[in-house]
Amino acid sequence: MVNNDKHDPLMLARQLPLKSVALILAGGRGTRLKGLTALRAKPAVHFGGKFRIIDFALSNCLNSGIRRIGVITQYQSHTLVQHIQRGWSFLNAEMNEFVDLLPAQQRYSTDHWYRGTADAVCQNLDIIRRYRAEYMVILAGDHIYKMDYSRMLIDHVEKGAECTVACLPVPLEEASAFGVMSVDKQHRILDFAEKPDNPTPMPDNPDMALASMGIYVFNADYLYQLLETDRNASDSAHDFGQDLIPKIVSQRLAWAHPFTLSCVTSGEDEHQYWRDVGTLEAYWRANLDLASVTPELDVYDRHWPIRSAIESLPPAKFVQDRSGSHGMTMNSLVSGGCIVSGSVVTHSVLFPRVRVNSFCSIDSTVILPDVNVGRSCRLRRCVIDRACHLPEGMVIGENAEEDSRRFYRSEEGIVLVTRSMLEKL
């Protein structure tokens, strides 16, 4: 028997993604990543051995059944555009499936580009309206997580919400970096503050605060009205978290969606993994998370694959040098096209086409594509940017004063090495 109940969960899970368009905000500079974003937008930064950061939001969309996607770009967009064209052009246009690139165009004024996250959507409203969506899923393109957006859409519809905000608990001392909310027992949002100096703790857990994940579901027509009103507001920063969400909350039209209800896990592990990799230390640590024996984020899950641009590369190779020293790795990710010769790599991530020459020791290090590590180098707790050529005998991560003089060293002691830094030596 066919169930015609419009709130039947199975029917909603099938239908709601087809009625939705996802908009990924991918124009951020990512200044806290320092030199990693000098030539690329933060969502285009390499991650996890073979991915780009934006691949997680894009893969979540596809795996959730959302196949109409807009990617809003602005800062240093060429690398991002090239990646999407090469890796995400397989959707079927005849079935109205697409990944649409939406660059900044100064649509309303030549005096400014995107003034905020809400303005980035507003300036593309003429295009977005033509998608004829019933629901808009607004996503950040710079977070690492696996989430079934169809479950959030179901929650949104069943509550009769105009706006739904995904949320998760974060330590109170870290909450000032997020939008923080208070909710009632039905998860209606009662109060919302963007990056407050004194975050409100959760009533049942005073050491934690309930933080926005920067993921929103809107009824499309309601969102269009909000954006049109906000566009001409002189006192607005034209930002979702700073302006629109507090306004919706004041009208009691916003609901919270706990990440626990839609987080995708695999096996018996039910840990909810979500990372903002906005700082060098967070980026380094999240990469090395994947090199652990049992990572909290499973990128090997065939039921929820993380897709990316595919390169035709030879297998990774580990060889001994002429002296008989064997190339070997332990607890590491090593991508295609890599060659490790007579060196030891421990708890590290090597992206495609990395060459590690003889007598090197590499520990707790993230090496981006096309890097050549000269003989007898020692690398520890560092990030090596793409296409760097490290000279023979270079030591990084052992002398804080020397590292700070030559490269960028974070407060946590993570060292970033870029081509421009090496050229100045």
Curated annotation (Swiss-Prot):
Pfam families: Hexapep_GlmU, NTP_transferase. Involved in the biosynthesis of ADP-glucose, a building block required for the elongation reactions to produce glycogen. Catalyzes the reaction between ATP and alpha-D-glucose 1-phosphate (G1P) to produce pyrophosphate and ADP-Glc. It comes from the Bacteria. Keywords: ATP-binding, Carbohydrate metabolism, Glycogen biosynthesis, Glycogen metabolism, Nucleotide-binding, Nucleotidyltransferase, Transferase. Coiled coil: none annotated. SUPFAM superfamilies: Nucleotide-diphospho-sugar transferases (SSF53448), Trimeric LpxA-like enzymes (SSF51161). Pathway: Glycan biosynthesis; glycogen biosynthesis. It comes from Pectobacterium atrosepticum (strain SCRI 1043 / ATCC BAA-672). GO terms for molecular function: ATP binding; glucose-1-phosphate adenylyltransferase activity. Alpha-D-glucose 1-phosphate binds at Y114, G179, E194, K195, S212. Its EC number is 2.7.7.27. NCBIfam families: glgC, PRK00725.1, PRK00844.1. Belongs to the bacterial/plant glucose-1-phosphate adenylyltransferase family. PROSITE patterns: ADP_GLC_PYROPHOSPH_1, ADP_GLC_PYROPHOSPH_2, ADP_GLC_PYROPHOSPH_3. This is Glucose-1-phosphate adenylyltransferase.
